[in-house]
Structure formats: structure tokens, C-alpha cells
């Protein structure tokens, strides 16, 4: 079994009889309206002959994993395989962008693709519709975690499916996030410190999970992207986007002793011989150690593409923007009463540009939409240009796709994450939100006992109230416990969540208990 790394999250897995591509992303228009580009450039793969493919896989709906141009160029005989999520958003997105119908694979069954035995897991909470794929032959196995977080119980079931430790695990070291990059409540120093803390939390998760997998090879995959639009070029230096070499060095310094690879497009790992054949051609012009000049040249090269994307959006006709905005959110209010109640906040949309306006959107048990007035109170604020609002209202651009472009500013008070606000904006779908509601209402009654740094004992819920991860692996600092999966932090004495709208049941035990 061989794995060719295609850049970003893309891989090509081949055996003597089977060849598949997963999450190939090669086009010169990047992703998220030209805000993300492949790093380093891998556009040469678009011209490759892929006629011998047995299948292509798209793990989830983010556009750095779903390349419509690549999928459209493929022969109709090559099936497009996707996980069967609670929502049909991924299916409909591929069908709309490519005029091809993907095949949904169930999560309950194993699937044979040529001589590759494949099984799919998804994140335990349906709030995050991302997937983990395992491929195995009689001799070798690969776990591709893509952008997903994997729980302790899932690691156990994956290793049971394989029958031991995997040969290769692919994990993301960088983030796909706009926090804290786009948030205005921080000065530059505070924002940098928040980013560093977030990077450390992510890499600690990678270290813990990679150690549990105990694979022969670990590949740091799926990012970071290059931000080539001049208006967001600054984000290339944000600590939340470490490159694979930075992540590799961090893990090695923390004592991870297995083989780690910081790959580039064209590198091929042969699991039979345990050798990595590097693409030396691409290394003539690019190095993970320093690519400052590379990014400047890359930005200049792609500028015409980015300008063209923006011009097309500018040309979108838009009348009655206020009515379209009102219709958009009043439909969203009817998607899920549960989400409205869990959000329970007022959002201010401050949109500049020729088709702009100012609006208040209240999500609660009695939601409402109105034009902004000077004395209106709000908890959250989004500011951006009206060209992007046209993409959302007229072309159904998902809010999450827009947020990932970093072309906005945000502010919130209190400064805590509201998972349900993002969930409703990104899904806007009854099936998806209902799956989350069922998951969150079916919480376990199991408890565990933990001890703080002072020796006090607390009985707490065994599973994190956010996404159901076991808190047995939680990190305890002073009177706080941090979930190792998504880094929600809880006060053991009160149960309050310090960084999100999500509380933990906690009870202090007597010393004799």
C-alpha cells in the first residue's frame, strides 16, 4: 500500500489493484471565494490523468476538501463517495456544484473499494459533521482523521476494527478557525496570546491522540492554507495556523518518539518498505522553514484569480436587501426552537457597502428580526462588506464558508463561545439540528470522581456536555478541568464553563468519600 500526498488534505491511496483519491483540492481559484489557497501550490495535479481511479472520496463539505473543478473533470464512471450525515447538505452541495450525484456510505457498515476495506466514523456530536476514514488491506492500515476530533472510545473501536495499531495516522496540526483572528475585543498582544494558547491546546490533543493510536507513521496533514488575498494576508503569521514542520518539531520536543512526517505534494510513503520518497522538485522553491518570499510571489501570481472572483460577486444584482435579510432569518427561526432557546442572544449585523444595512437578529424562544436602532442592545456583532452578504442571500453560501474566509470582524460580550449560534448558521437545516438536539438530550447519567490540585474531590459528569467526550482524559489545572477533545474548560466548584455556553454537573465530595 502506497500513499501519495497531494497537498493540504489530499491523498492518493494505491494498492496493486486499487487507486482512490480523498479530498483532492487542486484548482487555481482556491477555496472560500479565493481566501484560502493550497500551501505549497499543487495546481499541477489538476492536469494529471486520473482515469484509472476506482473512486474519489469527499470527507465533508468544506471547500478545501471539495474541489468542484477536479470532480467535474473526472469520468462519470468514477464514483464520488461521501459519508451519510444527518443533513443532506454535503450531497446537495456536490450535486449543485458538479451536476453529479455522490454515493452516500453508511456509518454502520464496512465498505469494499477494490481491495481496500473501508469504515467511516464521524465526530461523536453531530454538531460537527466531519469524518474519520479507515482503510485496510490484509497487511496494512491507514487512519485519516481529516479535520475531526477523535474520542478515546472511538480510538478503541478503530483499533478493534484494524486488529491492532495502525501503520499510518494522518492528523491536522493547524486550525480551520476564525477565532481569535477576526475578533475585535482583543488588542494585538492579547489576540496573539489567545492564538498561542489555542495552538498549544490543539497540539496537545494531537500528541495525546497520536500516542493513543501508536502508529508506525504520523503525518501532519490538512493545512495550513495560504491566505493570498492582500486584505487577509496578515493571517499567514497567526500562531493558530502552524505548518506541518512546526507541529512536527513541537511534538518531538514533547517526547513523541514515533516517526513524524511533514510532507509536501508529490511525496510518497510506501507502507510495505516503510520509506518516504520525497518530491525534491517542489523543495527547490519551497521550504517549511521559511516561505515568506514564496507567499509574496504566490500572492502576486494568484491576484488575477482573486480579483476575478471578487468582480463576479460585485456584479451580482441585489434589490430589496432588507426584505431578503428578513426572509433569510425568519426562515432560520423556524428551523429549530431548541437551537433558538440555546442561543438566547441578540446579534447585530453591521454591513457596509452599496447593498449594506444594519440589522438586529434575536435568537430566543421568541425570536425576532428588525432594523437596528441606535439604543439597541446586542451580545454579538458581525461587520463585513455587503458583497459577501449577497453571496449568502442570493447564492446560498453557507455562513461557515463565509466565516472561514476571514473577511469579517466580530465582537462578543460575554466573551464565550456559543456553539449553537454557529451550528444554526452553518446548518440552517432541520435534520441536522434535530440530530444535535437528540444527541444533547440523551446525555448519560454516568459520573466520575476527580481531584483538584488542592486534593479536593468532585463528582462530575463522565461525559463533556458539549460533544460527549469522556472527561476521564480531561486535564486538571487548579480548580478547572479541560476537555481534551474541544478544550471546553469547566470550574469544578461551580460547574460553569469558562469559554462557552455549556455547563457541567459537578458536586464537591466530603473528604471521607
Residue positions per predicted region:
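Zn-dependent metallo-beta-lactamase
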Residues: 1-43, 121, 426-449
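Catalytic core of the metallo-beta-lactamase
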Residues: 10-16, 110-166, 463
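Pre-active-site segment of Zn-dependent metallo-hydrolases
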Residues: 18-58, 68-73, 84, 150-164, ...
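Active-site neighborhood of phospho(di)ester-bond hydrolases with catalytic His/Asp-centered motifs
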Residues: 21-23, 52-64, 81-85, 143-149, ...
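Active-site HxH/HxHxD metal-binding segment of metal-dependent hydrolases
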Residues: 42-109, 477-509
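Metallo-beta-lactamase
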Residues: 82-140, 246-249, 261-262, 443-446, ...
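Cap/insert and terminal regions of metallo-dependent hydrolase folds
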Residues: 153-254
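Feature captures hydrophobic
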Residues: 269-463, 471-473, 481
Amino acid at each position: 500500500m502506497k500513499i501519495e500526498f497531494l497537498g493540504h488534505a489530499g491523498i492518493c491511496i494505491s494498492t496493486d489493484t486499487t487507486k482512490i483519491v480523498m479530498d483532492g483540492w487542486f484548482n487555481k481559484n482556491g477555496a472560500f471565494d479565493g481566501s484560502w489557497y493550497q500551501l505549497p501550490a499543487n495546481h499541477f495535479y489538476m492536469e494529471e490523468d486520473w482515469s484509472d481511479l476506482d473512486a474519489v472520496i469527499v470527507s465533508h463539505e468544506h471547500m478545501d476538501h471539495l474541489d468542484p473543478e477536479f470532480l467535474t473533470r473526472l469520468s462519470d464512471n468514477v464514483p464520488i463517495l461521501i459519508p451519510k450525515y444527518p443533513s443532506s447538505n454535503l450531497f446537495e452541495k456536490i450535486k449543485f456544484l458538479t451536476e453529479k450525484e455522490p454515493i452516500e456510505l453508511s456509518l454502520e457498515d464496512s465498505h469494499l473499494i477494490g481491495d481496500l476495506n473501508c469504515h467511516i466514523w464521524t465526530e461523536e456530536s453531530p454538531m460537527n459533521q466531519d469524518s474519520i476514514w479507515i482503510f485496510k488491506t490484509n497487511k496494512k492500515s491507514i487512519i485519516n482523521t481529516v479535520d475531526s476530533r477523535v474520542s478515546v472510545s472511538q480510538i478503541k473501536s478503530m483499533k478493534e476494527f484494524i486488529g491492532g495499531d495502525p501503520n499510518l495516522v494522518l492528523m491536522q496540526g493547524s486550525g480551520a478557525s476564525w477565532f481569535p483572528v477576526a475578533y475585535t475585543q482583543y488588542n494585538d498582544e492579547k489576540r496573539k496570546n489567545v492564538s498561542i494558547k489555542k495552538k498549544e491546546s490543539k497540539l496537545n490533543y494531537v500528541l495525546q491522540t497520536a500516542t493513543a493510536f501508536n502508529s508506525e507513521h504520523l503525518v501532519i496533514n490538512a493545512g495550513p492554507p495560504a491566505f493570498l488575498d492582500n486584505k487577509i494576508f496578515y493571517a499567514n503569521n497567526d500562531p493558530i495556523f502552524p505548518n506541518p514542520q512546526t507541529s512536527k518539531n513541537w511534538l518531538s520536543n514533547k517526547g513523541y518518539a514515533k516517526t513524524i512526517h511533514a510532507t509536501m505534494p508529490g511525496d510518497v510513503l510506501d507502507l510495505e518498505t516503510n520509506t518516504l520518497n520525497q518530491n525534491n522538485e517542489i523543495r527547490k522553491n519551497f521550504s517549511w522553514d521559511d516561505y515568506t518570499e514564496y507567499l509574496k510571489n504566490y500572492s502576486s501570481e494568484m491576484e488575477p484569480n482573486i480579483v476575478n472572483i471578487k468582480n463576479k460577486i460585485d456584479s451580482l444584482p441585489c434589490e430589496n436587501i432588507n426584505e431578503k435579510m428578513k426572509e433569510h432569518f425568519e426562515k432560520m427561526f423556524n428551523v429549530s426552537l431548541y437551537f433558538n432557546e440555546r442561543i438566547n442572544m441578540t446579534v447585530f449585523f453591521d454591513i457596509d457597502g452599496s447593498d449594506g444595512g444594519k440589522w438586529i437578529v434575536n435568537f430566543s424562544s421568541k425570536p425576532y428580526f428588525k432594523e437596528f436602532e441606535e439604543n439597541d442592545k446586542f451580545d454579538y456583532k458581525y461587520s463585513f462588506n455587503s458583497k459577501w452578504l449577497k453571496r449568502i442571500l442570493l447564492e446560498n453560501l453557507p455562513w461557515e464558508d463565509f466565516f472561514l474566509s476571514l473577511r469579517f470582524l466580530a465582537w462578543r460580550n460575554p466573551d464565550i463561545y456559543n456553539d449553537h449560534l454557529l451550528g444554526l448558521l452553518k446548518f440552517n437545516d432541520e435534520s441536522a439540528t434535530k440530530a444535535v438536539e437528540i444527541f444533547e438530550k440523551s446525555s448519560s447519567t454516568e459520573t466520575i470522581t476527580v481531584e483538584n490540585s488542592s486534593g479536593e474531590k468532585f463528582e462530575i459528569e463522565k461525559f463533556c456536555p458539549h460533544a460527549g467526550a469522556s472527561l476521564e482524559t480531561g486535564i486538571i489545572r487548579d480548580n478547572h478541568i479541560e476537555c481534551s477533545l474541544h478544550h471546553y474548560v469547566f470550574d469544578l466548584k461551580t460547574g460553569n464553563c469558562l469559554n462557552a455556553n455549556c455547563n457541567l454537573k459537578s458536586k464537591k465530595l466530603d473528604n471521607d468519600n
